[in-house]
UniProtKB/Swiss-Prot annotation:
Its EC number is 2.8.1.8. The keyword Transcription does not apply. Keywords: 4Fe-4S, Iron, Iron-sulfur, Metal-binding, Mitochondrion, S-adenosyl-L-methionine, Transferase. It is an enzyme of class 2 (transferase). It is found in: Mitochondrion. This is Lipoyl synthase, mitochondrial. [4Fe-4S] cluster 2 binds at residues 134, 138, 141.
Length: 372
């Protein structure tokens, strides 16, 4: 339960010693900083917010590299508190089956909408396979890291399939942590999960957001040919920033190679990637990244605002405006992406795109099933 303290905090200063006086001054300083900083309400969506209020927002949107102060959250990034029957139902089932989701581990701002159903009334959860601990330490990600995570749960593929079947979904997203400690990077485990899901429902569309498997093309082939419909692998940021944003084992060109080879192994796949904005990239660099993705055949692209998950992670350099995100959506369409989802709260697994991708896949299935 959240409790609001209406009366100001009273500080009693006893003139006992110099240290007591110093402590009082320190406390006053903290109170002043709290008064000027964001409150809990700053992170909750205001239903009365309108586009005009966004246009009139005069807060600072870009931080210089020498500045230590974090930027204040602009109104278009405020979201609602997750709640509702659907949200509680999915959360309880995940706990019961000991499954992890990237929705929780990565602190996704859309968790309330996706799990609760949102305006479309469709529940969507992105299940994170192979545990909640990653062998890599990307500087933007809040997922736990370790050199040797716990061993894989051999029951996870079946448990995941059971959960998906009970939800009655048309589209499911599977993602995973990186498991560089495993010889195959966990590719066979992911592939088995897809097969278990498809065995229970052949009509469900499965998207896998997978690691780069250290560039091992046999692992990429295993995933590409396991029966999934959408092969997703995120490029995350522009080439120049990659060494500073992603783990040192992740490489820009390696990501492009993985996406290219996945398409070569299975031309019927839809390939998908994602770019975070607000890390200090230039427009020219974003444009080049989009061109690079199109060159290797990527068909679906998402662009969203990077948001610092904790104080230990990279600070936001810039809050990109909704208008700028709209520009990138239009540019993506011009470059030939089948689908471009671009917005401040858009994430690689955001369900908004799944409705469109489902339509593409359904049409392809009809064409393939039609008598020749």
């Amino acid at each position: 339960m959240l409790r609001t303290i209406k009366s100001p905090i009273k500080v009693i200063v006893r003139p006992a010693s110099a240290s007591a006086s110093a402590n009082a001054e320190k406390l006053d300083e903290i109170r002043e900083r709290l008064a000027k900083g964001p409150s809990f309400q700053d992170f909750i969506q205001n239903p009365n917010n309108t586009k005009n209020e966004w246009d009139n927002y005069d807060g600072k949107l870009r931080r210089e590299k020498v500045e230590e102060q974090r930027l204040r959250l602009p109104p278009w990034l405020k979201t609602t508190i997750p709640m509702g029957k659907n949200y509680a139902k999915i959360k309880d089932q995940l706990r019961e089956l000991k499954l992890s989701t990237v929705c929780e581990e990565a602190r996704c701002p859309n968790i309330g909408e996706c799990w609760g159903g949102g305006e479309h009334g469709t529940q969507t959860a992105t299940i994170m396979l192979m545990g909640d601990t990653c062998t890599r330490g990307c500087r933007f990600c809040s997922v736990k890291t370790a050199r040797a995570p716990p061993p894989l749960d051999e029951n996870e593929p079946v448990n995941t399939a059971k959960a998906v079947a009970s939800w009655g979904l048309d589209y499911i997203v599977l993602t995973s942590v990186d498991r560089d400690d495993l010889s195959d990077g966990g590719s066979k485990h992911i592939a088995q999960t897809v097969k278990e899901i498809k065995a229970r429902n052949q009509n469900i569309f499965v998207e896998c957001l997978v690691p780069d498997f250290r560039g091992d093309l046999e692992c990429v082939k295993t995933i590409a040919n396991c029966g999934l419909d959408v092969y997703a692998h995120n490029i995350e940021t522009v080439e120049k920033l990659t060494p500073f944003v992603r783990d040192r084992r992740a490489h820009y060109r390696q990501t492009l190679k993985v996406l290219s080879e996945a398409k070569r192994f299975n031309p019927n796949l839809i390939t998908k990637s994602s770019i975070m904005l607000g890390l200090g990239e230039t427009d020219a660099e974003v444009e080049q990244t989009m061109l690079d993705l199109r060159e290797v055949g990527v068909e679906c692209l998402t662009l969203g605002q990077y948001m610092q998950p904790t104080k230990k992670h990279l600070k936001v350099i810039e809050y990109v405006t909704p208008e700028k995100f709209k520009h990138w959506e239009e540019r993506g369409n011009q470059l030939g992406f089948l689908y471009t989802a671009s917005g401040p709260l858009v994430r690689s697994s955001y369900k908004a795109g799944e409705f469109f991708i489902t339509s593409i896949l359904a049409n392809r299935k009809k064409q393939n099933d039609a008598p020749k």
